Every structure is written in structure tokens, then in C-alpha cells.
């Protein structure tokens, strides 16, 4: 699985004007299941992100996790993280998991983040979503399993 993690002051996701999820300080996690991924990869990635120390401590160092700060997570599916741009001008997405697998793993990943004790909001798999965020730092991290 692949994830693009952004430390945010706030973030929200809407579909057709309907607010699906919003958070205050925490993490916006854009996530993509890849061909061959399973629940083990989704669980491992969620556990790593839950422990990722990218929030400032009292000394201003990135030494605290989202759990340590009492922050939340907004988890949004984004199959375009599977883009292959090695040839031509149009990205290919064949490395992404098939939609049924992608949705199952997206839901599993979000549930695993929540099981780590992190308040979790989500988008809608496969929908045309509008994501708003106020990046804090900015801090943006790429992770893969």
C-alpha cells in the first residue's frame, strides 16, 4: 500500500456538497492499495503511521505521534498514488489494486487507524471528492509497504 501523509491544522472532504468528514489538528492520509496488497499490508501501514513522530514536542522537535497529541486522521482513498509516469505524458494506473480489493483494503486501513485510538473520519471510495486542508509546516511524508 502507498500513503501520502500530511500534517494538518484542519482538513475536510465533501462529495457533491455533502460534508463526509472533517478533522482539526492531525493527519490527512491519502491511501492507495496496490496490486497484490492484502490486509497484512494495510494493517502494517496503519500501525507505522499511528506511531510516526512528525508533531512537535515542547522543544520544537518532531518527536510526537498523532496519538501523543490527541489528533485525528482523515483517511481518503486516492488510486492516483499508483500512477506510473515512466513513459509518455499520460500516467498509467495498472499497478493499483482492482476496485473491489481497493475498497476493502481502504476500509480495513481506516478501521486499523481507528483501532489505534485515533479519531478517524473518511471520504467515500471511488467518489469525486473535494478535499480541503491547511497543511501544518508543511510536513508531507510518503510511505509504502
From Swiss-Prot:
InterPro entries: Daa-tRNA_deacyls_DTD (IPR003732), DTD-like_sf (IPR023509). GO terms for molecular function: D-tyrosyl-tRNA(Tyr) deacylase activity; Gly-tRNA(Ala) deacylase activity; Ser(Gly)-tRNA(Ala) hydrolase activity; tRNA binding. A motif (Gly-cisPro motif, important for rejection of L-amino acids) lies at residues 137-138. Coiled coil: none annotated. The keyword Amino-acid biosynthesis does not apply. Belongs to the DTD family. This is D-aminoacyl-tRNA deacylase.
Amino acid at each position: 500500500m502507498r500513503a501520502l501523509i500530511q500534517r494538518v491544522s484542519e482538513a475536510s472532504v465533501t462529495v457533491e456538497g455533502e460534508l463526509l468528514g472533517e478533522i482539526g489538528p492531525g493527519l490527512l492520509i491519502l491511501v492507495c492499495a496496490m496490486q497484490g496488497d492484502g490486509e497484512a499490508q494495510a494493517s502494517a501501514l496503519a500501525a507505522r503511521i499511528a506511531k510516526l513522530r512528525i508533531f512537535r514536542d515542547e522543544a520544537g522537535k518532531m518527536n510526537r505521534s498523532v496519538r501523543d497529541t490527541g489528533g485525528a486522521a482523515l483517511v481518503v482513498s486516492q488510486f492516483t498514488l499508483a500512477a506510473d509516469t515512466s513513459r509518455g505524458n499520460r500516467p498509467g494506473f495498472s499497478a493499483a489494486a482492482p476496485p473491489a480489493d481497493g475498497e476493502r483494503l481502504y476500509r480495513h486501513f481506516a478501521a486499523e487507524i481507528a483501532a489505534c485510538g485515533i479519531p478517524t473520519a473518511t471520504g467515500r471510495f471511488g467518489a469525486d471528492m473535494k478535499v480541503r486542508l491547511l497543511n501544518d509546516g508543511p510536513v508531507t511524508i510518503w510511505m509504502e509497504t
